Design a protein with these regions (language model features):
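Extracellular structured ligand-interaction cores
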Residues: 59-61, 88, 130-132, 149, ...
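Short, compositionally stereotyped local motifs that mark structural "simplifiers"
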Residues: 3-214, 219-222, 227-229, 236-241, ...
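Conserved ATP-binding subdomain of kinase catalytic cores across diverse folds
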Residues: 170, 194-369
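Short strand-loop junctions, especially beta-strand C-caps/beta-turns
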Residues: 76, 287-291, 475
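Middle-to-C-terminal accessory/interaction subdomains
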Residues: 173-190, 195, 199-201, 213-215, ...
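Short, glycine-/Ser/Thr-/acidic-enriched flexible segments
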Residues: 69, 78, 98, 175, ...
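Short, conserved micro-motifs enriched in small and acidic residues
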Residues: 125-129, 292-300, 397, 401-402
């Protein structure tokens, strides 16, 4: 049946082509081959491209077919109109990297360019580029069709930094990214208003009001993604929504992006198993590394070291981003914690999931938030030296999850923006026989890219710090059973999860994978080599060598008689 449909489509296209194209332009044999082996949705589409999106060793001519000869196309990600280029015949697609830089030369994407700081540089060379062709046609009544687009990467086998990583092309109307009014990636009008009413010297540039600091659905923009796996095979083409992601890192470069699948964009799930876990998420994050912008490995390392612990961790996959056709850096694509994540990995129905993040309700009802506050107040203020109170706390919390989470964060020397922020926990609302539908709160690890796992904080007394910063942990620590269990688990982690050779091996593997991609990233945004990347890797290895002895001392110093 599938073959029959393809043959019908081929014959139909042949007739259309015969009518609308001259004999010199029309090559039936060529067209049939390309329709059969074109994009997986090409037979169903009204607009057909003679080449599927992807990677090509040599330049080629691209033909576009539609039910009308009024076909228009763009090369900058914008929607085609009658003001765009009209398709008059096959288009030569060559290595777009030879074209002049456009958006990569912008200085309105970060406040740093308005200061004397020299952290970021616009590229003084031609950055790598792909060709984005977005086409639409007009019928006899003047109605415009939905647009179709393809990303073409030509001569990339000669370019370094793309082996063994995935590629994602994101395209959207340029105004969605860089417009003064609606652009989510620029200082924009929000900054103009901020500058008129504030002394810029009174705060760091990354805290200045700017479009990219704005949040919420109104600052989400429709975009189109094309994802290519490590073999450079197209695995996903989908309309999505994009937003800037992060806290302070919104004011840095490059910026992280949240990517949303929604019914309004055509599908409420990503149609690709990004992490080979059978999970088709609604949301993912393209993470720039946050404050770990020189190394970009701390979040992944923290998650992979602790993936067998009794708390949630994310999966990470390496990507190079091309934004409206231009190279835009190295990223890790990660999951987002939400009810769909919990349903998939913990077999808890999404409507039964409650998630609290940084003390705020992420998933659930106001009654659920009240239940969280009641638990929090009890654990923080009840006398935990009374055994009955401690046992009550154990019915509210998954104590193994709590201990694993705090032990891991403390061993990693997490501080500064934790535990007062960057924490999350979840539970089921209703109780059942399922192991994770027991109504107990469990913890979620994320954002380990600030003050963690590096040698200049290997001697930090993180236990004393947490005893001051977390009322919940401090109160539980007054209980002898809790202290004994926590201390034993922390020492066990030192010899297993955080054992030196294990960390060194992981970091060495990251260096092998990320070395060339990070060279591209550092040249693109900092105008430097990636020496600092390897230095960051060395700092992690040094931390692995020395941290254990400090942890042992830390437990002794904070012992309770």
């Amino acid at each position: 049946m599938k073959i029959k449909k393809q043959l019908i489509a081929i014959l139909t296209l042949a007739v259309i082509a015969f009518i609308s194209l001259s004999a010199a332009e029309f090559n039936l044999k060529y067209m049939i081959a390309e329709v059969i082996y074109g994009d997986k949705n090409s037979v169903e589409s009204e607009i057909l491209f003679s080449k599927k999106a992807g990677f090509y060793e040599e330049e080629f001519y691209l033909s576009i077919y539609a039910p009308s000869d009024e076909i228009y196309y763009t090369l900058d990600g914008s929607e085609p109109t009658k003001e765009s280029m009209k398709y008059e015949g096959a288009i030569l697609v060559s290595d777009a990297s030879r074209n002049e830089n456009t958006n990569s030369m912008r200085t309105d994407v970060c406040g740093s360019f308005l200061t004397d700081e020299t952290l970021y540089q616009v590229p003084d060379y031609l950055v790598d580029k792909c060709t984005i062709i977005k086409a639409a046609y007009y019928d006899k009544e003047g109605n415009r069709s939905e647009s179709e687009e393809r990303a073409y990467f030509v001569d990339f086998e000669e370019k370094s930094g793309y082996d063994n990583i995935n590629i994602i092309s994101i395209t959207t109307e340029p105004e969605n990214l860089f417009g003064e009014e609606q652009g989510i990636y620029v200082l924009g009008n929000t900054f103009k208003e901020f500058a008129e009413n504030n002394d810029l010297s009174a705060s760091n540039y990354y805290r200045w009001g700017a479009n990219y600091l704005n949040r919420g659905k109104e600052w989400e923009r429709e975009a189109y993604i094309q994802v290519f796996d490590e073999e450079k095979t197209l695995v996903l083409s989908q309309s999505v929504g994009i937003r800037i992601q992060g806290g302070v890192s919104r004011g840095l470069l490059p910026k992280s992006l949240n990517i949303y699948a929604r019914t309004e964009y055509g599908n409420n799930r990503m149609q690709y198993d990004f992490f080979d876990t059978g999970y088709y998420p609604q949301r993912v994050t393209l993470s720039s590394g946050g404050n770990d912008y020189y190394g970009k490995m701390l979040d992944r390392l923290g998650a992979e070291l602790t993936e067998e612990c009794e708390f949630c961790t994310m999966n990470y996959e390496p990507y190079a981003l091309f934004l409206n056709g231009e190279y835009w850096g190295f990223y890790y694509l990660t999951e987002k914690y939400d009810e769909h994540y919990i349903e998939h990995y913990y077999d808890v129905a999404q409507e039964n999931v409650i998630i609290i993040k940084n003390g705020n309700l992420e998933v659930g009802t106001e009654e659920d938030k009240e239940a969280y506050e009641n638990m929090k107040n009890f654990v923080e203020y009840a006398d935990m030296t009374v055994e009955q109170n401690y046992q009550m706390a154990c019915t509210m919390l998954d104590m193994d999850s709590f201990i694993d989470y705090f032990a891991a964060e403390i061993y990693m020397s997490r501080q500064v923006d934790w535990p007062s922020a960057n924490y999350a926990l979840w539970r089921s609302r209703e109780v059942s026989e399922k192991p994770y539908e027991d109504g107990k709160w469990r913890w979620m690890l994320f954002d380990v890219n600030t003050a963690a796992l590096i040698s200049d904080i290997d001697d930090h007394d993180t236990l004393a710090y947490v005893l001051q910063e977390s009322k919940m942990f401090a109160n539980l620590y007054t209980n002898a059973e809790f202290r004994e269990t926590f201390s034993a688990r922390l020492l066990e982690m030192a010899d297993t999860i955080f054992e030196e050779s294990r960390i060194v091996q992981m970091v060495s593997e990251y260096e092998e994978l990320m070395g060339e991609p990070m060279e591209n990233n550092h040249q693109r945004f900092f105008g430097t080599s990636n020496d600092v990347f390897y230095y960051r890797a060395k700092m992690i290895k040094d931390f692995a060598h020395t941290r254990k002895s400090y942890v042992e001392t830390m437990l002794k110093v904070n012992a309770v008689d």
